A protein has these predicted regions:
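A conserved beta-strand element that flanks and buttresses the S-adenosyl-L-methionine
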Residues: 31
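Structured loop/turn residues at beta-strand edges in well-structured enzyme cores
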Residues: 25
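Hydrophobic adenine-recognition pocket in adenosine-nucleotide-binding enzymes
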Residues: 35
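A short, conserved alpha-helix within the catalytic core of class I
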Residues: 39-58, 67
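Class I (Rossmann-like) S-adenosyl-L-methionine-dependent methyltransferase catalytic domain
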Residues: 1-22, 63-214
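Surface-exposed cleft-lining segments at the edges of enzyme active sites
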Residues: 38-46, 145-152
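Conserved acidic residues
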Residues: 28
Length: 214
């Protein structure tokens, strides 16, 4: 209700869920900007099915669903290490790791070189690339965003899009629909505040254009 009131105040047209449920073959394009990962994070399986069915029904037969969202780690099970940028941020990174484990966003790290109240050396972690992906992209939000962001997964794979949209509703396989990878270099200084890295390890956003096959 708060969001709807803000949209009204800014003269922005919108549809309520009830209106969208009664909409059929209406839109040429439905644009999901940083929405897909939130649907995966917060909705139950029945709620996801209901939401994607509703969007598919509202789209014209020749319409397109555009998904712009986080990317993914292409080799999620590979084991590697990463180093915290300095001892001054050891504890902040460690807090994020503990919270992400608690919320089942990441698995327990295989090896953790963490000493409580150690002010001399930056921590070094050995874990999967998937864990590193989630840890790094979450930590840059800062602890003020911990409660909200630590509940969300940022891994948006083609397989996940296929599972929830393409196969159930007859869209082309998502891996063939990857339209663009964005590397926003303004992210790099924020990542380097917490981690010893020289370049962006992954795209900061990916864009899919999903088209119907029937």
């Amino acid at each position: 209700q708060i969001v709807q009131n803000q949209l009204k105040e800014n003269d922005i047209d919108f549809l309520t869920k009830e209106q969208l449920q009664n909409t059929e073959d209406e839109f040429d394009v439905i644009y999901l900007s940083s929405v897909f990962h939130e649907l995966m994070s917060y909705l139950s399986r029945p709620e996801r099915r209901e939401t994607f069915a509703m969007l598919d029904k509202a789209l014209k037969p020749d319409g397109v669903i555009v998904i712009r969202d986080w990317g993914y780690e292409p080799n999620p099970n590979d084991i590697t290490s990463f180093e915290v940028a300095s001892s001054t941020v050891n504890e902040e990174v460690y807090i994020w790791i503990k919270e992400l484990i608690k919320n089942s966003i990441i698995e327990n790290l295989r090896v953790v070189d963490h000493i409580e109240n150690d002010e001399l050396e930056p921590d070094i972690y050995v874990t999967t690339k998937q864990n590193i992906y989630e840890i790094m992209l979450h930590t840059v939000w800062g602890l003020n965003s911990l409660e909200r962001e630590a509940q969300e997964t940022y891994s948006v794979t083609p397989e996940l899009i296929d599972k929830w949209i393409c196969r159930p509703y007859g869209y082309r396989n998502a891996k063939f629909e990857l339209n663009q990878e964005e590397y926003d270099e303004t992210y790099l200084p924020y990542l380097q505040k917490y981690f010893k890295i020289d370049e962006l390890p992954w795209p900061t956003k990916i864009i899919y254009e999903l088209r119907k096959t029937k």
